[in-house]
């Protein structure tokens, strides 16, 4: 499963509607609304959580995965040492935040979070970018 910064994950492109995603992945294993009334799809086999933003016409805008073969810029990263992976990436600015045994490593320019526990990557979060000038999402999907 390819994590594609700024664009999406696997065959899913930021800006897709739920029908586009269902066409590619099928019905989700679970679906619910979060506290902001966004629609959340969970796909167990792919270890994938997708967010469709309520205030953006239910467009796909955020993904979380812990899929064992998830890759970022050509390298598998789940279970790998977080320090080695971050050093190997071309992204230079990272914000780090600790929560108990978990550490989030956030790169704002790619809206990418690499989450680690005990020094190993356990999941990756990626979101659609926001245009600073217009304060609106940059939707890569044009269909």
Task: Tell where the protein language model's regions lie, with residue ranges.
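A short, surface-exposed helix-loop junction/capping segment
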Residues: 1-5
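A cross-family detector of function-defining hotspots
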Residues: 16-58, 71-72, 76-143
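Helix-adjacent hinge/juxtasegments
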Residues: 61-71
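Short, recurring structural edge motifs at helix starts
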Residues: 6-11, 70-75
